[in-house]
UniProtKB/Swiss-Prot annotation:
Its main location: cytoplasm. Interacts (via RPEL repeats) with ACTA1 and PPP1CA; ACTA1 and PPP1CA compete for the same binding site. The modification Phosphoserine is found at residues 67, 78, 467, 505. This is Phosphatase and actin regulator 1. It is found in: Cytoplasm; Synapse; Nucleus. Binds actin monomers (G actin) and plays a role in multiple processes including the regulation of actin cytoskeleton dynamics, actin stress fibers formation, cell motility and survival, formation of tubules by endothelial cells, and regulation of PPP1CA activity. Involved in the regulation of cortical neuron migration and dendrite arborization. The lineage of its organism: Eukaryota, Metazoa, Chordata, Craniata, Vertebrata. The gene is Phactr1. The keyword Phosphoprotein applies. It comes from Mus musculus (Mouse).
């Protein structure tokens, strides 16, 4: 359909009078938002009959759109208000021209760098980097604030000072609560040292427990009845790296007073409310069946006290750690509950025995402290224990076996490295000996006499071949070797010189050759100047050719071409001569 050409202002009513409904819709799609909305929402009869007050009669400038087809497709979707607003928004986004209507907002053109912000966002990089620095600095500050010095830990009671003056030695109190509020791990077994302790409540941990004295449980209602341990939830975990184990003995008298025993008993009862109670005979069982399935061999009977000190703690720790590492992989199951009879309490370890007043006497109990790797900062250093007396829970044979196993574990990896690196040396060492090769008939068996005979045969062959060489006289007779005499050689040289000089003296000069006209080449009679008279510097008057020189050269060339130059008779007319 051909649209009428209008260069004047139109309103809604005049447009409907000129065009039908379809052409009016197409026309007003390119106009302002108000005109398009009125065209879409109102049927033609209503729009024609609408009152003049409802119609916006402000002039609208007609602007030609790029294409009408996509807008018609959008208009046919729906005739409700929401669809009309969506069509208006899409039309405004796709149009590059600004429609200066009162109800039409100006279209914001997209910059060519608009998509660059979606990909390249350096401000976010800076933010991420700063946040990362903040997190790391906060973590470092928190760790530094949590780390305390040795003096503060001694003041808090976590560590105890070591005195070497009067022979009194005290070790770190592992029963107190640690710095970060963590209790002892499942691998920490501790028999409480017989010293005054303050009952400190500890958080409930199913894997941490204390070992009480046998007399505490013997005071119960039925000392002869078997005591059952509650089932401990034990997780079968893969073998962990070996932990350092310290077995230290608190120094004290073999017999304690009733007051110290009562204080110890009250403190143990306060701690036992939050932990499992284990008998000393069960302590042996716990050492054999650890929380992770570890066998720790225990020594029966009272452990002897070493009077002058013990060996280096590192050796004991090393043997215990290697034993634990070896036995972790072998043990897979841990029994849930065990029962012991009261007879085992009296005869197993000899820890308690009846004393006067009917109260049991308490002997020294070794404290087994397994260092936990979780909280290394609050644990005293190993040199603090070097001078303290220790007790050994191993016999000499078991220690030797552990040391052998340790050495084999450490040397096996080294041996594998040596085997990998020195494979050539191993192959060379595996070479068969001479005797084996002789037995396999690879090398012939020879005695010393046979070797001497073989050498003599080779020598005779060489001498026979050397004797067959011709002598100098034979070579002279064959004219292969000429006899040399200095006088004769000098005479020959003189004769050669005389012959050459005679030939050179008989040579004709250039002038004689010119006169005889027997010059063969053009270069034979070219005069050569001496090096002293010749000057290679340019722009000298004697280096420039004059006109007469050039004419002489041209004449000489023409004569050469006409007389001396060999030219075929049929092509002689093609020879070019220089101007005279």
């Amino acid at each position: 359909m051909d649209y009428p050409k209008m260069d004047y202002f139109l309103d809604v009513e005049s447009a409907h009078r000129l065009l039908d409904v379809e052409s009016a819709q197409r026309f007003f799609y390119s106009q302002g938002a108000q005109a398009r909305r009125a065209t879409l929402l109102l049927p033609p009869t209503l729009m024609a009959a609408s009152s003049e007050d409802d119609i916006d009669r402000r002039p609208i400038r007609r602007v030609r759109s790029k294409s009408d087809t996509p807008y018609l497709a959008e208009a046919r979707i729906s005739f409700n208000l929401g669809a009309a607003e969506e069509v208006e928004r899409l039309a405004a986004m796709r149009s590059d021209s600004l429609v200066p209507g009162t109800h039409t907002p100006p279209i914001r053109r997209r910059s060519k760098f608009a998509n660059l912000g979606r990909i390249f966002k350096p401000w976010k990089w800076r933010k991420k980097k700063s946040e990362k620095f903040k997190h790391t600095s906060a973590a470092l500050e928190r760790k530094i604030s949590m780390r305390q010095s040795r003096e503060e830990l001694i003041k808090r009671g976590v560590l105890k000072e070591i005195y070497d003056k009067d022979g009194e030695l005290s070790i770190s109190n592992e029963d107190d609560s640690l710095e970060n509020g963590q209790s002892l791990s499942s691998s920490q077994l501790s028999l409480p040292a017989l010293s005054e302790m303050e009952p400190v409540p500890m958080p409930r941990d199913p894997c941490s427990y204390e070992v009480l004295q046998a007399s505490d449980i013997m005071d119960g209602p039925d000392p002869g009845a078997p005591v059952k341990l509650p089932c401990l939830p034990v997780k079968l975990s893969p073998p962990l790296p070996p932990k350092k184990v310290l077995i230290c003995m608190p120094v004290g008298g073999p017999e304690l007073t009733l007051a110290s025993y009562a204080a110890q008993k009250s403190s143990q009862q306060a701690v036992a409310q939050h932990h499992h109670t284990v008998l000393p005979s069960q302590m042996q069982h716990q050492l054999q069946y650890g929380s992770h399935g570890q066998h720790l061999p225990s020594s029966t009977g009272t452990l002897p006290m070493h009077p002058s000190g013990c060996r280096m703690i590192d050796e004991l720790n090393k043997t215990l750690a290697m034993t634990m590492q070896r036995l972790e992989s072998s043990e897979q199951r841990v029994p849930c509950s065990t029962s012991y009879h009261s007879s085992g309490l009296h005869s197993s370890d000899g820890i308690t025995k009846a004393g006067p007043m009917g109260l049991p006497e308490i002997r020294q109990v070794p404290t087994v402290v397994i260092e936990c790797d979780d909280n290394k900062e609050n644990v005293p250093h190993e040199p603090d224990y070097e001078d303290s007396p220790c007790l050994y829970g191993r016999e000499e044979e078991e220690e030797e076996e552990d040391e052998d196993d340790d050495a084999s574990l450490y040397t096996s990896s080294l041996a594998m490295k040596v085997c990998r690196k020195d494979s050539l040396a191993i192959k060379l060492s595996n070479r068969p000996s001479k005797r084996e090769l002789e037995e396999k008939n690879i090398l012939p068996r020879q005695t010393d006499e046979e070797r001497l005979e073989l050498r003599q045969q080779i020598g005779t062959k060489l001498t026979r071949r050397l004797s067959q060489r011709p002598t100098a006289e034979e070579l002279e007779q064959r004219n292969i070797l000429k006899p040399r005499n200095e006088q004769e050689e000098q005479e020959e040289k003189r004769e050669i010189k005389r012959r050459l000089t005679r030939k050179l003296s008989q040579r004709p000069t250039v002038e004689e050759l010119r006169e005889r006209k027997i010059l063969i080449r053009f270069s034979d009679y070219v005069e050569v100047a001496d090096a002293q008279d010749y000057d290679r510097r340019a722009d000298k008057p004697w280096t420039r050719l004059t006109a007469a020189d050039k004419a002489a050269i041209r004449k000489e060339l023409n004569e050469f071409k006409s007389t001396e130059m060999e030219v075929h008779e049929l092509s002689r007319h093609l020879t070019r001569f220089h101007r005279p």
